[in-house]
Regions:
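Ligand-binding pocket scaffold of soluble enzyme catalytic domains
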Residues: 20-23, 33, 101
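Conserved donor sugar-nucleotide recognition element shared by glycan-biosynthetic enzymes
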Residues: 27
Length: 195
């Protein structure tokens, strides 16, 4: 183990501390290869639910198709992703990259002023936002040129019935979702169409 890589001691047994990558292979090529080789293995987990590589590929392709076909986004358009580390994030980032979009990462803890600057500076016209942060966008929405808002909830990709219970608990019991008014917003669950 290298002393300049102290995190390596936390790697699972058999995990190399260095990967040789071909600079001509894209992130999507790597994802497709991983899906082909590890289809049923867990790619991501959150709150006790998992997504296999096969599921990530399917969901990211569905999301990419939605962005292109339903929202009309084109290669080079920018999409802001304002989410914590939840399973929707890798689906959204891989879907956006599959669609040829430029991803603008936005801290879900940003203040309205910080969010406004990030969106204006990046030129993003679409945002996928965690419901718990939607009130921040609502505060500055009229000052931005956002055309599409996609809202995701904590439980959107969790297993049934855990996802439903989690959404109810977060919003109504723990009251962790401040009120917001974004009437034209699209719900992430509605973007999951068969391709």
């Amino acid at each position: 183990m290298s002393t300049d890589k102290p995190w390596v001691k936390n790697y699972p047994e058999g995990t190399p501390d260095h990967l040789e990558l071909d600079p001509n292979r894209t992130l999507i090529t790597l994802l497709d290869e991983a899906e082909s080789e590890f289809q049923e293995l867990t790619a991501f987990s959150n709150f006790g639910s998992t997504l296999s590589y096969k599921e990530v590929e399917k969901l990211s392709k569905q999301f990419a198709a939605y962005l292109q076909n339903d929202l009309g986004l084109k290669k080079g358009d920018r999409i802001a992703l304002m989410m914590p580390n939840i399973m929707q994030y890798p689906v959204a980032i891989f879907g956006a990259i599959r669609a040829g979009l430029i991803v603008v990462n936005v801290n879900p803890l940003y203040t309205p002023r910080e969010l406004k600057h990030q969106i204006q500076d990046s030129g993003a016209r679409t945002i996928m936002i965690f419901e718990n942060s939607a009130h921040v966008l609502d505060t500055v929405f009229s000052e931005l040129e956002i055309e599409h808002v996609i809202i995701t909830k904590i439980g959107d990709l969790l297993s049934f019935p855990k996802g439903i219970f989690m959404n109810i608990a977060v919003k109504y019991l723990k009251k962790m979702v401040p009120p917001y008014n974004l009437p034209e917003a699209i719900q992430f669950k509605d973007t999951r169409k068969a391709i």
